[in-house]
């Protein structure tokens, strides 16, 4: 069994155990459920900051304990530096293990609050199941990167970009995170090392690592919320945007949706679970180009904006793509659609204005 498969099995078992042992109860009132999800996310973010603080203080404590050695001679100074580096790697590894475990536990508690159906939980062995999507979000893994529905997420990345990506995937998460923090510490030492000891420098760097943990966990929680919300909200958005039924859409509208999703997926470099659910309904893309009229393009753009708002992505490539959609749809209409989706997510307001 490969390490990757072993990690998957551990994550699945951790999620299922947390789900069955959780004291959370399903909350029928969706506004109350949303508040509970907010609390769970906030607590997870706070715990990540505390984990970063404890890890950093442990390293600083070891550095202070070894400080007298550094003044004896060069070999002792080298030994102290090596011990601090090893302590940093071990502490960061334990810290990351705690963060992954805590994310999986939080994912299970969130699923319990929203009362994810048993039939979905029973699909956990399937790669494209709802529990797998939650687990991957909790572990910081991206969505599906293979070709699905005739769309290759990595098609526009280029040969050299693909080579770099393959190289990075071979670097283990724990090792890379430990190395990253070690590099930051070395930079910090170079910057203020002349006016402070190594131990003091590590202590002063503590807020940086706490902030990194908070930012990382906040991103993870947002991704988990997006996938949970998408599970319930996506069918409602589809029904509202296409009251005639997705099977009865015109060829031009289907083609516009496929083209739009292809652009979004290639910009993100992976297929989001919300997109997978929709593409499963749309089926394979028509290889021959289909003429799209103005009304079909407008309906497709409105729907693409809604799904993009649900995913919460906002990097440079997404913003560039969003500007193109806004240009076609208009700033006013784009803002209205986003506000309607935002209200549906956070205030559970029903869709009332026609999108047809």
Residue ranges and their predicted role:
Residues 1-81, 105-305, 316, 320-324, ...:
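Terminal, membrane-proximal amphipathic helices
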Residues 87-112:
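Hydrophobic alpha-helical membrane-embedded segments
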Residues 84-94, 133, 304-308:
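Short acidic, glycine/Ser/Thr-rich loop/turn "cap" segments at secondary-structure junctions
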């Amino acid at each position: 069994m490969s390490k990757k498969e072993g990690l998957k099995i551990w994550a699945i078992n951790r999620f299922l155990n947390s789900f069955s042992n959780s004291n959370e109860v399903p909350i029928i009132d969706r506004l109350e459920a949303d508040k509970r999800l907010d609390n769970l996310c906030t607590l997870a973010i706070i715990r990540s900051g505390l984990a970063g603080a404890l890890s950093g203080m442990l390293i600083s404590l070891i550095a202070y304990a070894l400080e007298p050695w550094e003044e004896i001679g060069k070999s002792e100074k080298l030994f102290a530096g090596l011990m601090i580096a090893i302590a940093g790697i071990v502490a960061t590894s334990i810290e990351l293990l705690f963060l992954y475990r805590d994310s999986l536990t939080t994912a299970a508690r969130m699923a319990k609050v929203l009362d994810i159906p048993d039939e979905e939980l029973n699909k956990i062995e399937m790669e494209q199941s709802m529990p797998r999507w939650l687990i991957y979000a909790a572990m910081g893994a991206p969505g599906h990167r293979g070709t699905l529905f005739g769309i290759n997420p990595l098609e526009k990345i280029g040969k050299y970009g693909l080579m770099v990506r393959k190289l990075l995937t071979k670097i283990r998460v724990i090792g890379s995170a430990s190395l990253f923090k070690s590099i930051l510490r070395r930079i910090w030492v170079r910057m203020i090392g002349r006016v402070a000891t190594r131990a003091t420098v590590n202590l002063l760097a503590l807020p940086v690592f706490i902030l990194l943990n908070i930012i990382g966990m906040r991103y993870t929680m947002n991704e988990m919320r997006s996938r949970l919300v998408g599970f319930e909200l996506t069918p409602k958005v589809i029904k509202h945007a296409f009251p005639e039924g997705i099977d009865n859409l015109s060829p031009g509208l289907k083609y516009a949706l496929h083209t739009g999703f292809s652009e979004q997926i290639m910009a993100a470099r992976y297929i989001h679970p919300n997109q997978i659910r929709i593409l499963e309904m749309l089926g394979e893309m028509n290889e021959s180009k289909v003429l799209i009229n103005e009304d079909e393009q407008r309906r497709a753009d409105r729907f693409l904006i809604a799904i993009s708002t649900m995913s919460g992505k906002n990097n440079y490539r997404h913003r560039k793509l969003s500007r193109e959609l806004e240009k076609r749809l208009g700033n006013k209409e784009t803002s209205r659609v986003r506000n309607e989706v935002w209200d549906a997510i956070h205030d559970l307001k029903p869709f009332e204005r026609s999108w047809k």
